[in-house]
Amino acid sequence: MATKKAGGSSSNGRDSIGKRLGVKKFGSERVIPGDIIVRQRGTKFHPGRNVGMGSDHTIFAMKSGSVSFSVGLRGRRFVHVV
């Protein structure tokens, strides 16, 4: 019988993988319908003109054009395709 308990491994040493969130198309970049503009958790950016929002809050283009960002009331950031 062992007189000393076996040394356990550390409970640290792991991390979750990155989720590749963020802005994918920046201001004045050209987009076509269906292009993803922003991947996000929650509504950091809100959909504006010619832009839709998916169930996971992904912002995507609904028409062809160039991307523009604006700040609305109460500091809300909007994404538009014009």
Curated annotation (Swiss-Prot):
- What gene does the UniProt entry assign to this protein? rpmA
UniProt cross-references to PROSITE patterns, sorted A to Z: RIBOSOMAL_L27
Return the NCBIfam families for the record. L27
A GO BP entry is: translation
Matching PANTHER family: LARGE RIBOSOMAL SUBUNIT PROTEIN BL27M, RIBOSOMAL PROTEIN L27
State the similarity comment: Belongs to the bacterial ribosomal protein bL27 family.
Q: Which GO terms describe its cellular component?
A: ribonucleoprotein complex; ribosome
The organism encoding this protein is Neorickettsia sennetsu (strain ATCC VR-367 / Miyayama) (Ehrlichia sennetsu)
Region Disordered: list its residue ranges.
Answer: 1-20
Record keyword Phosphoprotein present: no
Q: Which GO terms describe its molecular function?
A: structural constituent of ribosome
Q: What is this protein called?
A: Large ribosomal subunit protein bL27
Q: Which InterPro entries match?
A: Ribosomal_bL27 (IPR001684), Ribosomal_bL27_CS (IPR018261)
Which superkingdom heads the taxonomic lineage of this protein's source? Answer: Bacteria
